[in-house]
């Protein structure tokens, strides 16, 4: 029945979106079905958007911890799902997996653009970046901050809205 399939789908999404209770935390491939991926990607994007929104809406002044570190740890679920799926797509693909990849790729591109071109998020990153000399960051933190700032800049965060829209269209 539909309810039964919905329940099973939620269990499968759970398998992909939660930490794996397996030796070495490896993906339980025998329990993952191709039809589980699209809803899992949708859930992963939803969770990642919520994490980004929490960073953007944080009323506290931007700091390394509440902006750069939080950004570095955001999207873990989506990253895990993507790693599993795209490794399967590369190593053991079939027509169904390729079809899913065609459906998922635009969703991931749109999400990536929404993050990289988010003016409020970039403003927080830029604020921290401009204060980097005063923050007493260690080498690893300095590298992370530099990479995050440059990634936003190189991916269009400094563009005008018209140019950002042109970039999204590509």
Labelled PLM ranges:
Residues 9-170:
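Zn2+-dependent metallopeptidase catalytic domains
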Residues 1-10:
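N-terminal low-complexity segments that are often proline-rich with Ser/Thr-Pro
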């Amino acid at each position: 029945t539909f309810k039964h399939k919905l329940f099973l789908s939620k269990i499968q999404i759970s398998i992909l979106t939660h930490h794996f209770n397996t030796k070495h935390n490896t993906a339980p491939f025998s329990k993952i079905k191709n039809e589980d991926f699209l809803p899992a990607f949708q859930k992963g994007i939803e969770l990642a958007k919520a994490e980004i929104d929490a960073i953007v809406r944080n009323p506290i002044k931007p700091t390394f911890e509440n902006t750069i570190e939080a950004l570095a740890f955001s999207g873990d679920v989506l990253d895990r799902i993507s790693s599993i799926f795209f490794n399967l797509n590369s190593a053991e693909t079939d027509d169904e997996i390729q079809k899913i990849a065609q459906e998922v790729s635009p969703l991931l591109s749109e999400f990536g653009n929404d993050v990289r071109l988010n003016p409020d998020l970039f403003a927080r990153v830029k604020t921290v970046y401009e204060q980097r000399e005063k923050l007493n960051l260690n080498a690893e933190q300095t590298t992370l901050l530099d990479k995050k700032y440059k990634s936003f800049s190189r991916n269009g965060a400094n563009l005008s809205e018209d140019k950002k829209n042109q970039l999204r269209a590509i």
